[in-house]
Structures are given as structure tokens and as C-alpha cells.
């Protein structure tokens, strides 16, 4: 008799995706981040659901409802901090996952890569609207500053901003709709993630060498299920260390002050995972130019397959490209640091140089370096 997991209509799908899936025999720990992102998403949806049971999306009570969750709800504090720090873990995994894709040339799977970029945008949107919900000072002013950027769009900008706000400023209507968006978006992310997996399983996984691995496949279970479980344990360990020992390490103290439209905080800045994009936005003195640079900094990922000039897929055997990749990582870390600094000398010029370098490496240096490597190998 054939095993039920291979015949049952639903179990067959699960089987082909997580059990009998043929996987390359040499994929490293950099391939763990996909499953970790899945775990992060499930964790965020569950903790978010329990928070939503006690949260009220009204300007008068939002801040105190979050305080109530932390003080009066059973284990409310741990649920709240798991959700807040879970977002940070989500973005750490996302950046590692995207970095892996860039390093090993996974972007040549066009459909998978493009859905991935859409997923990145959706997760960033979810995190942004979620940050507004506690209705602290940084929530309010972050929402005001970022939504205001849309007013840079010619002709329709002002109308668009007021339409999103639901009035003439960030107020009750804005908070209510942001809560609605924050609730629905994770389920859209889950659906997109399934499409992402669907496209991936059409082609099979890439591997560190970038060479087709059809001749050497192993079943996903038990080899990679056990490897994923180790990754999950390390993720949960790191998350719980943050939650239990330094829950506010990555947050902003200003968000413990209730939102006050009459008092602007001295330094308005987003959460750490948006700082690199915020630094690029601030490095251009023109409003529309800054917005375009901000969007381009993420949208540039869609161009990666077009900018790939190397005859090899992966960077594994391309030392010059490897150097450039790690310079790009250092540049992004520099931008992250600059995004959290005040707008004054020398941070302005450092931010501008780092922003120019970011686009220059991706658009100019990487394609040229790949061509040089091809010539050195006489290809």
C-alpha cells in the first residue's frame, strides 16, 4: 500500500514541499533563512493576534491599552516584547536571506526573486504601520514624516497624503486604518510566501557553487529538517535573550512618551532596520529626489539579474566580486549608523558618500568586475 502522504491530495502537497523534496546535497547554513523567515512570520501572526485581543486602535486609548497589556494582561509583557523584537529578528533573517541571494546568484530564478522583492516591500510596509500602533511620540512623528514623503509626488501628492491620513493630519482615522492594514498584511505576506515557494520548487534550490545539482540530490527530510530545527532553536534562543534581558535595546525611548502633536522629538528616526534607507533619503537635499532614492535603494534588487555579467552564477570562485560584496555590506552598515545620527557635520557628508557608493557598487563596479573576471579566466 502506498504511503498516505503520497496519495492524499493535501498531504501530497506538504510531502512534495517539505519531505520528499529533492534538495542539493551541499547547501550551507545560508539556506536556513527561508525556513527561519517562515517561523518568524508564524510567531509574529500568533503574538500579534493575542496583542490585538487587548489593543484598542483609538488615539485616546491606544497608548494606555499597550501599557495595560504590559501591566495587567497575563504574560502580556512577554507577548508584546516577543512581537516587537520578533520584527527585528524577521529583518535580520530577511537581510541575510537577500544577501545570500546576491552572493550566490539566486536572483537568476527570476520569478522567485521578483516575488521575493515584492515580499520585502510588503514586510517593510507591515513593520512601518505596526510601529505607529503604540501611539508614542516616535510612532506619531514617524508616521507624519514618512507619509508626508508622498506629498513629493507631483500634482497628486497632497491629495494622496490626505487620503491616506483620512484627514488633514495624522489622527484617529490614520491609526484605525493602520491597525487594519497591520492586521491584513501578514496574511498577504503568507500567501505571497507560498507563491515564492511554488516558483522555487519549479526550479529547485540553488547551491553555493552555482552549478546545477540535478545529479546529486538528497531528500529534504531528514537531512534539512534537522538542520532547520537547529536554526530555529538558535533563532528562538537569540530572540528570548533579547526579550528577557534587553527588551528595549532596539527600541526608541521616545516611544514611551504618549504622542503629542504639539511637541516634536529632537531626532525623528525609524526602527534600526529602516535606518539604511532613511540615511539614503536624507542624503539628498531635494524632497522628490530623496523619495526616489529611497524607493530605488530597494527596487534596485529587481535589476540584479540584468546587471549580472559574469559567466559564473555564484561568487564562490570570484574573489574580486567577493571583495565588492563585502564592501557593499560594510557600506550598508555605515548607512545604518548614519541613519541614526543627527543631521550635522560630519554625518551629512559621510551619508552622502555612502549613498553614492551604494548605487555605484551595484550599478557600475559589480558588472565591470564580473567582466574583468571573465577575461582573466579567458572566457
Swiss-Prot record:
The chain crosses the membrane at residues 33-53, 77-98, 113-133, 178-198, 226-246, 288-308, 320-340, 347-367. A ubiquinone binds at residue 201. Its cofactor is heme b. Heme b b562 binds at residues 83, 182. Binds 2 heme b groups non-covalently. It is a multi-pass membrane protein. Component of the ubiquinol-cytochrome c reductase complex (complex III or cytochrome b-c1 complex) that is part of the mitochondrial respiratory chain. The b-c1 complex mediates electron transfer from ubiquinol to cytochrome c. Contributes to the generation of a proton gradient across the mitochondrial membrane that is then used for ATP synthesis. The cytochrome bc1 complex contains 11 subunits: 3 respiratory subunits (MT-CYB, CYC1 and UQCRFS1), 2 core proteins (UQCRC1 and UQCRC2) and 6 low-molecular weight proteins (UQCRH/QCR6, UQCRB/QCR7, UQCRQ/QCR8, UQCR10/QCR9, UQCR11/QCR10 and a cleavage product of UQCRFS1). This cytochrome bc1 complex then forms a dimer. This is Cytochrome b. It comes from Cervus nippon. The gene is MT-CYB.
Amino acid at each position: 500500500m502506498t504511503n498516505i502522504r503520497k496519495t492524499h491530495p493535501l498531504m501530497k502537497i506538504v510531502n512534495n514541499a517539505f519531505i520528499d523534496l529533492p534538495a542539493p546535497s551541499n547547501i550551507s547554513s545560508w539556506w536556513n533563512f527561508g525556513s527561519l523567515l517562515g517561523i518568524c512570520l508564524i510567531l509574529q501572526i500568533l503574538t500579534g493576534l493575542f496583542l490585538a485581543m487587548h489593543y484598542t486602535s483609538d488615539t485616546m486609548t491606544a497608548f494606555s491599552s499597550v501599557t495595560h497589556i504590559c501591566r495587567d494582561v497575563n504574560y502580556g509583557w512577554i507577548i508584546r516584547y516577543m512581537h516587537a523584537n520578533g520584527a527585528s529578528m524577521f529583518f535580520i533573517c530577511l537581510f541575510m536571506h537577500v544577501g545570500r541571494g546576491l552572493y550566490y546568484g539566486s536572483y537568476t530564478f527570476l520569478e522567485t526573486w521578483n516575488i521575493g522583492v515584492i515580499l520585502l516591500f510588503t514586510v517593510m510596509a507591515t513593520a512601518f504601520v505596526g510601529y505607529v500602533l503604540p501611539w508614542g511620540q516616535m510612532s506619531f512623528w514617524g508616521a507624519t514624516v514618512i507619509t508626508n514623503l508622498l506629498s513629493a509626488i507631483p500634482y497628486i501628492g497632497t491629495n494622496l497624503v490626505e487620503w491616506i491620513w483620512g484627514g488633514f493630519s495624522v489622527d484617529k482615522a490614520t491609526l484605525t486604518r493602520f491597525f487594519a492594514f497591520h492586521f491584513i498584511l501578514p496574511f498577504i505576506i503568507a500567501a505571497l510566501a507560498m507563491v515564492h515557494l511554488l516558483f522555487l520548487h519549479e526550479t529547485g534550490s540553488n547551491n553555493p557553487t552555482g552549478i546545477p545539482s540535478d545529479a546529486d540530490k538528497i531528500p529534504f527530510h531528514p537531512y534539512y529538517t534537522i538542520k532547520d530545527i537547529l536554526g530555529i532553536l538558535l533563532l528562538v534562543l537569540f530572540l528570548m535573550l533579547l526579550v528577557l534581558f534587553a527588551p528595549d535595546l532596539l527600541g526608541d525611548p521616545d516611544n514611551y512618551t504618549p504622542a503629542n502633536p504639539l511637541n516634536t522629538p529632537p531626532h525623528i528616526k525609524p526602527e534600526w532596520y529602516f535606518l539604511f534607507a532613511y540615511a539614503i533619503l536624507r542624503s539628498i537635499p531635494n524632497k522628490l529626489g530623496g523619495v526616489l532614492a529611497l524607493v530605488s535603494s530597494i527596487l534596485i534588487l529587481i535589476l540584479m539579474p540584468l546587471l549580472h555579467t559574469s559567466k559564473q552564477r555564484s561568487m564562490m570562485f570570484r574573489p574580486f566580486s567577493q571583495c565588492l560584496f563585502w564592501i557593499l555590506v560594510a557600506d550598508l552598515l555605515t548607512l545604518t549608523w548614519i541613519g541614526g545620527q543627527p543631521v550635522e557635520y560630519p554625518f551629512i557628508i559621510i551619508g552622502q558618500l555612502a549613498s553614492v557608493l551604494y548605487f555605484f557598487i551595484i550599478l557600475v563596479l559589480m558588472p565591470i568586475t564580473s567582466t574583468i573576471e571573465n577575461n582573466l579566466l579567458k572566457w
